């Protein structure tokens, strides 16, 4: 979609291309104080908002998707083995060298940017509503790191030169996130419009609290390996329900508005109009490249001839993300609209996202996917073979359907926005 957050750039560029003959410059321009205009603040804030775009596109997505019950990270007789980073996620054989878990620095950088703008805008003396968005993003980034890595440093200030900030227990980080969110929610915007899309709002912060609270016993457990889900007591459950109710009663969201069906919510033209999205990353092939989900989820040789998307793919596909049989079962239910996001059984051709009855042909034959994945060997490579049989192992996701111009002309990037918090999660 075409994002609105960066419209301030156009204003700046217009100024750069205009001649100037008026030398009566305001005296403030002689100083290096931080600009206080709305445009200047928006420019600085946008850098924070987009800090998670890179990890969400690739490494964070790999770590979350492949280590869950959703996908398996396959290899093809050595192709896409990549030091077992993908299969390690699926088998929970994590290594410090795995690229798929290497997003810590990018997310921590977002925290540093947030801390810098908080200082630039006045720190503790700043108006609460001015720095609330930066504090919200700082809390969100802490959540991502805490959820992924456990014990992490609490980065609530700009570090001094050579300052060592020690890791804190996961429980303390969770409590810090909670404290921050409770403090800033009253100062965040409560609108849900094109202007607030992709930015922290009251609803984004409340949705983050819900996610924090629903897993509170895990995050605050003395030791996760000793946590017993059958006997825990969630002291935050009432608060979790209360914030769900707040989002529901706010009346800003619903499951269907802005979409023409479940699958269309995730198409390349999705945007702020999709009222199921509480908080989303607004990828755009013109201004925010990097959303490349189709590259890893598309059948490996779909680039041969015309793809099952209905157009020729000019860039190669990895094809290594295969849905687990258990996940596939959830999306192959009779009469369920969500079935449309899964490529299953005999592959059909699609026409502008609509499944046709025409078989897709590869090397002269229709192709049929196997729900139950067969490996060539029972080892950590998860090798299915570099051949048609291997490519057909596992159903594939077409949830974030690509379009030709994006994929072929922008380095496999896509316009599809990625929801981080959805109204469906709250319900």
Predicted regions and their residues:
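Sec-dependent bacterial lipoprotein signal peptides
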Residues: 1-18
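Short coil/turn linking the two alpha-helices of tandem helical-hairpin repeats
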Residues: 146-148, 153, 215-224
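TPR/Sel1-like alpha-solenoid repeat signature
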Residues: 135, 206-209
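Short, surface-exposed recognition loops and adjoining beta-strand edges that mediate ligand/DNA contacts
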Residues: 34, 39, 59-75, 158, ...
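Membrane-proximal, proline-rich intrinsically disordered regions
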Residues: 20-67, 94-96, 234
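Conserved, well-structured interaction surfaces
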Residues: 38-56, 77-149, 163-175, 179-197, ...
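Elongated scaffold/linker segments in the mid-to-C-terminal portions of large proteins
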Residues: 45, 49, 53-56, 81-102, ...
């Amino acid at each position: 979609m075409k994002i609105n957050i960066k419209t301030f750039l156009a204003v700046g560029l217009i100024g750069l291309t205009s001649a100037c003959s008026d030398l009566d410059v305001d005296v403030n321009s002689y100083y290096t104080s931080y600009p206080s205009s709305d445009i200047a603040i928006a420019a600085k804030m946008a850098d924070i908002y987009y800090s998670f775009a890179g990890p969400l596109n690739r490494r964070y997505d790999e770590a979350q998707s492949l280590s869950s019950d959703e996908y398996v990270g396959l290899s093809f007789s050595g192709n896409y083995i990549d030091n077992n980073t993908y299969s390690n996620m699926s088998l929970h054989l994590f290594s410090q060298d795995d690229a798929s878990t290497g997003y810590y620095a990018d997310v921590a950088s977002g925290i540093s940017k947030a801390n810098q703008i908080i200082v630039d805008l006045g720190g503790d003396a700043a108006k609460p509503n001015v720095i609330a968005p930066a504090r919200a993003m700082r809390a969100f980034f802490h959540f991502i790191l805490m959820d992924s890595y456990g014990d992490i440093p609490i980065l609530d200030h700009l570090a001094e030169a050579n300052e060592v900030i020690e890791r804190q227990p996961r429980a303390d980080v969770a409590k810090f996130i909670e404290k921050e969110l409770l403090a800033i929610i009253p100062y965040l915007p409560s609108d849900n419009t094109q202007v607030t899309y992709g930015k922290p709002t009251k609803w984004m912060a409340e949705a983050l609290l819900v996610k924090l609270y629903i897993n509170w016993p895990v995050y605050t457990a003395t030791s996760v390996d000793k946590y017993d889900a059958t006997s825990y007591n969630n002291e935050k459950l009432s608060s979790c329900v209360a914030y769900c109710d707040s989002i529901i009663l706010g009346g800003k969201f619903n499951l269907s508005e802005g979409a023409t069906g479940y699958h269309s919510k995730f198409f390349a033209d999705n945007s702020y109009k999709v009222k199921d999205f509480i908080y989303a990353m607004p990828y755009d092939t013109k201004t925010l490249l990097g959303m490349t989900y189709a590259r890893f989820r598309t059948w490996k040789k779909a680039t041969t001839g015309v793809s099952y998307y209905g157009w020729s793919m000019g860039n190669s596909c990895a094809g290594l993300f295969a849905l687990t049989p258990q996940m596939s079962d959830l999306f192959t239910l009779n009469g369920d609209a969500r079935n449309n996001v899964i490529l299953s059984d005999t592959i059909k051709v699609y026409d502008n996202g609509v499944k046709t009855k025409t078989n897709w042909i590869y090397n002269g034959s229709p192709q049929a996917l196997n729900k139950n994945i067969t490996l060539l060997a029972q080892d950590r490579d998860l090798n299915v073979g570099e051949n048609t049989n291997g490519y057909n192992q596992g159903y594939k996701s077409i949830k974030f359907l690509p379009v030709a111009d994006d994929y072929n002309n922008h380095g496999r990037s896509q316009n599809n926005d990625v929801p981080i918090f959805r109204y469906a999660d709250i319900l």
